Each structure stands twice: as C-alpha cells, then as structure tokens.
Amino acid sequence: MTMPFYVSPEQLMKDRADFARKGIARGRSVVVLGYDGGILFATENPSRALHKISEIYDRIAFAAVGKYNEFENLRVAGVRYADLRGYSYDRKDVTARGLANAYAQTLGTVFTTESKPLEVELVVAEVGDTPEADQIYRLSYDGSVADEHGHVAMGGQAEQLGKRLDDGWREGLTLTEALDLATTTLGAVGTDGQLLAAGSERTIDAGQLEVAVLDRARPRRAFRRLHGAALTHGRGAPHGEGAR
C-alpha cells in the first residue's frame, strides 16, 4: 500500500511564505512617508489605468504591491467596508486601524486555509489633524500588521530601501523634500530589480511615477494625486482624484 504523502505544518507554512514573498518581490516598490502637511505615497508605475495607490475613505488611503487582481479585490472590499461602516454608524468611526484589522483577518485566513496565499503586501494610512496623529499600517501576506512610524517601503528590495528612508527621513519634511526622498529611494532599484550603489540612482521620468498625498489641510477628502509640474519640479498645485 502506498504511504500517504505528508508535509509537516512547519514546512507547509514555510513554502507558502516563500511563494508569497517571491511574488511580492517581482513587483515594483512602493514608498510611503509622512511630511509636514500629510502623508506621501509614491511608486514607479507606467500604467495610467491600473493604480497601486488609491483612496479608501475621507482621510484614509491604500497602497499595495504584488498581484494586481488580488490587491484590487482587497481595495474594493476595503471601500465597501468603509462605506458600510460610515453609513451604519458615523464617518468618524471609519479608521485605518479598523480597516487594517479587517484586512489582517482576510489575509491570515487565506494564508492558512486556502490552496495558495495572496501575493500582496499592503499599506493602510490615515492622516490626522497633526503629524503625531498620522497612522501608517503595513500588512504582510500572512495577515501580520506592523504599526510604522514616519515611513515604510514595500516590494522588491524593501529592506534596503527602508534603510535609505531611515537615513533620509526626518520629522517636518516639506512636500518637496518628501517627494525628492521618495523618488531618489525608488530610483535606487534598477530596471532589473537589483539594488544600485549609492550615488548611482536612476532618475525616474515623471510620466512613470504614480504619486498621491493625504493632505492634512483638506477639510474632508484628503486624498489627491500629483501630476505634471508638481512631480517635475517637486512643487506646485496638485490636481486630480479627490479634489472638490
């Protein structure tokens, strides 16, 4: 009689984690960092139709790396969660922490029970009335949640990019300084996905960037995208989604 094939739980979880990490590492990195006027999101994304950075609710935004169809489904679910909670209770009851907890449950359940884990990594951020009140949560493929302070990098070479953000970030950055730091950090990864030496960073064309902010000064919907001159010169009036 043929013996049944056995895989230990430890090996099964390790294989799932390795599978998810490889899928995430193939995606282009996303960086999120706080500045004096809010929270900045930036990634290299040549597509004008497929967004990796999106608005979720009034003062909450979402960024992701990995398989687009998987994190897009999570984004839509997050919007529905926020809309339903805001409608059923109060708009102030919709928080990044609550959304992060909901995502963590979904990611953790899929990781342990489904045939394959989701190949995604997420950031959920909420801008507060002051920089100290800003919230940035990073969610991994297995449902683990990290409360980040100031900045975070996701995707291929995330650890090395995080160290570069550590070196360049400080409290009270202006939007121009934050944008310069974000684009320089993203440019530290070559087109082949390998980390470049310090001082040899690529200059990413503005048309290849997807950048958005949660603007603390906006009265209700804080999310807006940065385009054109605002990216080329690191300053200027942003335009786009969320403007009212």
From Swiss-Prot:
It holds the Pfam family Proteasome. One of its GO terms (molecular function) is threonine-type endopeptidase activity. Keywords: Cytoplasm, Proteasome. GO terms for biological process: modification-dependent protein catabolic process; proteasomal protein catabolic process. Its main location: cytoplasm. SUPFAM superfamilies: N-terminal nucleophile aminohydrolases (Ntn hydrolases). Pathway: Protein degradation; proteasomal Pup-dependent pathway. GO terms for cellular component: cytoplasm; proteasome core complex, alpha-subunit complex. It is found in: Cytoplasm. The formation of the proteasomal ATPase ARC-20S proteasome complex, likely via the docking of the C-termini of ARC into the intersubunit pockets in the alpha-rings, may trigger opening of the gate for substrate entry. Interconversion between the open-gate and close-gate conformations leads to a dynamic regulation of the 20S proteasome proteolysis activity. InterPro entries: Ntn_hydrolases_N, Proteasome_alpha-type, Proteasome_asu_bac, Proteasome_sua/b. Belongs to the peptidase T1A family. The 20S proteasome core is composed of 14 alpha and 14 beta subunits that assemble into four stacked heptameric rings, resulting in a barrel-shaped structure. The two inner rings, each composed of seven catalytic beta subunits, are sandwiched by two outer rings, each composed of seven alpha subunits. The catalytic chamber with the active sites is on the inside of the barrel. Has a gated structure, the ends of the cylinder being occluded by the N-termini of the alpha-subunits. Is capped by the proteasome-associated ATPase, ARC. Component of the proteasome core, a large protease complex with broad specificity involved in protein degradation. This is Proteasome subunit alpha. It comes from Xylanimonas cellulosilytica (strain DSM 15894 / JCM 12276 / CECT 5975 / KCTC 9989 / LMG 20990 / NBRC 107835 / XIL07).
